[in-house]
Amino acid sequence: MKKIVAMIPARLGSKRIPKKNIRLLNNKPLVQYCLEAAVKADCFDEIYLNSESEELSSIAEKCGIKFYKRPEHLSSDDSTNDHFALDFLENVDADVLVQILPTSPFITSEEINLFAKDMVDNDYDTLISVCDNQIECLYNNEPINFDKTNITPRSQDLEPVKSYACSLMAWTKDSYVENYKKYDAAYHGANGKIGTFTLKGYSTVDRRASCR
């Protein structure tokens, strides 16, 4: 059996929205919503809150999960998801890592379970949560999913264009470490079998000012 570990990354510092991860939403710290959803899901062997700040450890304890103290040098604005996920995987025993962003407070335990199941059942190396955008989309001012020489299509007839939701990401430890060593980056999967998992409705709401 593969060991599946959940990680919720939550820096205390943020330049655009200071202490956003512990700001209250309906009288509850923002980060607590996804922690509770992760606990309610029944797919994880361990759940960690990953932060540089001990201030968040009390929230982890309250939710009955583990706290991982991120090194200070990985808590700056210059550090990326690639960096702190690698640090976590190098120090925590896991076969599969599922990352849940605290800035997605409406993610549900049911979606988390389905996401983790999809990752394992399909033997993905990387699984990315996405939104389907069923609207006319452009890239470099050129149409992606419609013909500009034809009449305006009905939205329901358009081929959906996928964009990152970021709320949920998953990687196998082996593929993540291998990609990082080869490319100095691993967040997007690089090599290996990559899948997408579509989120809908409020689960795609993201309160990020940064992805950490």
For the regions a language model picked out, list residue spans one by one.
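N-terminal nucleotide-binding beta1-loop-alpha1 segment
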Residues: 1-18
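A short, N-terminal amphipathic alpha-helix
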Residues: 30-47
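Short, high-confidence coil segments that cap the C-terminus of an alpha-helix
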Residues: 44, 94, 123-124
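Short phosphate-binding loop-to-helix
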Residues: 48, 54-98, 107-114
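Conserved core of the sugar-phosphate nucleotidyltransferase
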Residues: 84, 105-188, 197-198
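Active-site acidic Asp-centered loop
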Residues: 100-102
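Hydrophobic helical membrane-anchoring modules
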Residues: 189-191, 195-212
